[in-house]
Amino acid sequence: MAELTISASDIEGAIEDYVSSFTADSGREEIGVVIDAGDGIAHVEGLPSVMTQELLEFPGGVLGVALNLDEHSVGAVILGEFEKIEQGQQVKRTGEVLSVPVGDAFLGRVINPLGQPIDGQGDIEAEGRRALELQAPSVVQRQGVSEPLQTGIKAIDSMTPIGRGQRQLIIGDRKTGKTAVCVDTILNQREAWATGDPKQQVRCVYVAIGQKGTTIASVKRALEEGGAMECTTIVAAPASDAAGFKWLAPYTGSAIGQHWMYDGKHVLIVFDDLSKQADAYRAISLLLRRPPGREAFPGDVFYLHSRLLERCAKLSDELGGGSMTGLPIIETKANDISAFIPTNVISITDGQCFLESDLFNQGVRPAINVGVSVSRVGGAAQIKAMKEVAGSLRLELSQYRELEAFAAFASDLDAASKAQLDRGARLVELLKQPQYTPYPVEDQVVAIYLGTGGHLDSVPVEDVARFESELLEHVKASHGDILAGIRESKKLSEEAEQKLANVINEFKKGFSASDGSSVVVNEAEAEAMDEADVEKESVKVRKPAPKK
């Protein structure tokens, strides 16, 4: 057995070799100290070089965002569990701003505002990351709104049309159907998605801010049952989340949508709702001791929404021609659209659909108030067929509402006013639509033509919905070429209009009202004049008596 010998010179040489090859890793790291924490906010002393909106790392891997940069301290919003953060704990800079993972793998998934999946379906393979705070496209990077985004809702597509790249505000009191309008719009994109054509496909992002967990679950279930979840991403910041998550959720959804928009694709994003984001931002600002303004909101609450909604755009052809259409939702109180946040968002967006609680309670659903609702740029994107048949719809409905209020006090009305009231009542009934039943645009054109063309004037009001549905089934079954022509050419030619009128008149002959009566009007023929009376003067002129 060989003896183990230890040579002092060998040991000395090994140590010298190690010391000569050793390089000390020296680095400079800024560390701050928590001086107070609570309610999702922490004040940190130190960190003199921290950037605004920079991510900070708290003990336990909890992240925060630096918002207030004071002379000796930093005010940060905690993203996550803030109960374990205590005074005296160390805080590190990350040198990064907040970003989220993006990509097609997010379709069909539910994520939180940090981009982490919360639906229990495993991890998501992202294509890259995108910063939450990015500059909106400039004027030269945009083009005008020219392509329609069909909502499937007759009242919107006919009177307040929405184009790709537009921001259309959905505003109204609680429980007036605002979320239902947006969910129906998402459901209406499923047929375009099924075509596989990138020019027609629309990817949808639904951002739930401060909603109840059951409400978010019901929206997800409705999208799954309607077959639209495969083209939708849900960003959820429920009411139980901290204010920081509710503040960031819309920017997360916008970043995911912008990734697709700059890739030449079309996106629809729903913010449900921005009132709760403003409330969360107000809470954060007050806790950070920022000076309050009107309704206790901070001075930059307008910028909070403007920099978010300006990201919705129709990009120029040089940048791929992609688009992101925004449907922000705002909740009013007692139908007051002159409050601070509603007026802010109205001034930022390209139009609004005002849902009224009185109409909703009367059974008019969707409860859109035609007089206040408007689309400033969507008219350029409306198809010609719809423009032709719906041109007089808004005016007739507005006159009907005015006459309706007047008729409540008038005992006797002339025949023209009565006819206008009868026509208006049938138009209101025609525009009613059940939830989760979006209409294809060609069906909408036929339905609106029924009302504005006077074909419903002889149909009792209570039978309008049945007449419309049975006629559409008849046209689809026996005259599908009319619908196909509208769908392909986007026009209603004179020949097609005449054929449609004949089909409606023939259908009326076989349709019976609920009381069993016919809806065909038999106009009495005028009696022919005798030839001997044609040249006879029938007007007697009485000369005034001569003055005395």
Curated annotation (Swiss-Prot):
The record's region (Disordered) falls at: 526-548
Q: Which domain of life is it from?
A: Bacteria
Q: Residue numbers for the site described as Required for activity? A: 373
Membrane topology, as annotated, equals: Peripheral membrane protein
For this protein, the Enzyme Commission number is: 7.1.2.2
Q: Which UniProt keywords apply?
A: ATP synthesis, ATP-binding, Cell membrane, CF(1), Hydrogen ion transport, Ion transport, Membrane, Nucleotide-binding, Translocase, Transport
Could you say which residues bind ATP here?
Answer: 172-179
General function of this protein = Produces ATP from ADP in the presence of a proton gradient across the membrane. The alpha chain is a regulatory subunit.
Similarity-based family: Belongs to the ATPase alpha/beta chains family.
Question: What is the recorded name of this protein?
Answer: ATP synthase subunit alpha
Q: How does it assemble?
A: F-type ATPases have 2 components, CF(1) - the catalytic core - and CF(0) - the membrane proton channel. CF(1) has five subunits: alpha(3), beta(3), gamma(1), delta(1), epsilon(1). CF(0) has three main subunits: a(1), b(2) and c(9-12). The alpha and beta chains form an alternating ring which encloses part of the gamma chain. CF(1) is attached to CF(0) by a central stalk formed by the gamma and epsilon chains, while a peripheral stalk is formed by the delta and b chains.
Under Gene3D superfamilies, the record lists:
2.40.30.20, ATP synthase alpha/beta chain, C-terminal domain (1.20.150.20), P-loop containing nucleotide triphosphate hydrolases (3.40.50.300)
A single GO CC term, please?
Answer: proton-transporting ATP synthase complex
Per UniProt, subcellular location reads as:
Cell membrane
* HAMAP family on file: ATP_synth_alpha_bact (MF_01346)
